[in-house]
UniProtKB/Swiss-Prot annotation:
The lineage of its organism: Eukaryota, Viridiplantae, Streptophyta, Embryophyta, Tracheophyta. It comes from Lupinus luteus. This is Protein PR-L1. GO terms for biological process: defense response. It comes from the Eukaryota. Belongs to the BetVI family. Keywords: Pathogenesis-related protein, Plant defense.
Length: 20
């Protein structure tokens, strides 16, 4: 997806890059 963590299983309101 567009907004995810390591994989598509966890969608968020911000890109994974902000969390990694």
């Amino acid at each position: 997806g567009i907004f995810t963590f390591e994989d598509e299983s966890t969608s968020t309101v911000a890109p994974a890059k902000l969390y990694k």
